[in-house]
Amino acid sequence: MSETYDFLFKFLVIGSAGTGKSCLLHQFIENKFKQDSNHTIGVEFGSRVVNVGGKTVKLQIWDTAGQERFRSVTRSYYRGAAGALLVYDITSRETYNALTNWLTDARTLASPNIVIILCGNKKDLDADREVTFLEASRFAQENELMFLETSALTGENVEEAFLKCARSIPNKIESGELDPERMGSGIQYGDASLRQIRQPRGSAAQTKQQCNC
């Protein structure tokens, strides 16, 4: 009945309205393009189990509305997110210019160490491009983000965007930047034995003490 997995990661898909966030989620979950997609009202949800470094990981993905009138609602879903796709439309400079605000929200409301990948969506509309690859690459580098251009229509780089983000999370667990034992980390163990992943530097006693708080 229930799915078995080693880890569960909470993901967000954030960005301005009309950037194709719901279509990216649908392409990743269903492996097909979502025709006649309307603007998301509030939040939508999807999940998929993937393989990350030999571990089975369930991605629990929240697709948030990009319209300003829903921001107060969607911000509540940022809490406890381990990863995020920050999406803009390569044919709309307005959506690109709004990225800083979305990024600030994510790092303030979710976690300073949330893993974020910048996605320039609608790559299939290259002839109508308003934001160059180089410009977005620089933004990503300056803000310590991963970066890919994607197409929810053709599926190009959609799978890779989610998986690239997911692959970075175990590294942050091992380095101590993300702590699955901390409430709101956006990470849950499906297999209790995996708690050993974060026992470097002789921190077992410290972790035990933290858990008793």
From Swiss-Prot:
SUPFAM superfamilies noted in UniProt: P-loop containing nucleoside triphosphate hydrolases (SSF52540)
Any one of the GO BP annotations: regulation of endocytosis
Compartments, record wording: Cell membrane; Early endosome membrane
Motif annotated as Switch 2, chain positions: 65-74
Primary role: The small GTPases Rab are key regulators of intracellular membrane trafficking, from the formation of transport vesicles to their fusion with membranes. Rabs cycle between an inactive GDP-bound form and an active GTP-bound form that is able to recruit to membranes different set of downstream effectors directly responsible for vesicle formation, movement, tethering and fusion. Mediates endosomal tethering and fusion.
Recorded superkingdom: Eukaryota
InterPro entries referenced in this protein's UniProt entry, alphabetically: P-loop_NTPase, Rab4, Rab_GTPases_membrane_traffic, Small_GTP-bd, Small_GTPase
Cofactor(s) in the UniProt record: Mg(2+)
Gene3D superfamilies: P-loop containing nucleotide triphosphate hydrolases (3.40.50.300)
Residues involved in GTP binding: 18-23, 37, 39-40, 66, 121-122, 124, 152-153
Catalytic activity: GTP + H2O = GDP + phosphate + H(+)
Presence of keyword Transport: yes
Regulation of its activity: Regulated by guanine nucleotide exchange factors (GEFs) which promote the exchange of bound GDP for free GTP. Regulated by GTPase activating proteins (GAPs) which increase the GTP hydrolysis activity. Inhibited by GDP dissociation inhibitors (GDIs).
Family from the record: Belongs to the small GTPase superfamily. Rab family.
CC per GO annotation: early endosome membrane; insulin-responsive compartment; plasma membrane; recycling endosome
Pfam families registered for this protein in UniProt: Ras
Binding-site list for GDP: 18-23, 121-122, 124, 152-153
Motif (Switch 1): 39-44
Residue numbers carrying Cysteine methyl ester: 213
Source species of the chain: Danio rerio (Zebrafish)
Name of the featured protein: Ras-related protein Rab-4B
Domain notes: Switch 1, switch 2 and the interswitch regions are characteristic of Rab GTPases and mediate the interactions with Rab downstream effectors. The switch regions undergo conformational changes upon nucleotide binding which drives interaction with specific sets of effector proteins, with most effectors only binding to GTP-bound Rab.
An example Gene Ontology molecular-function term: GTPase activity
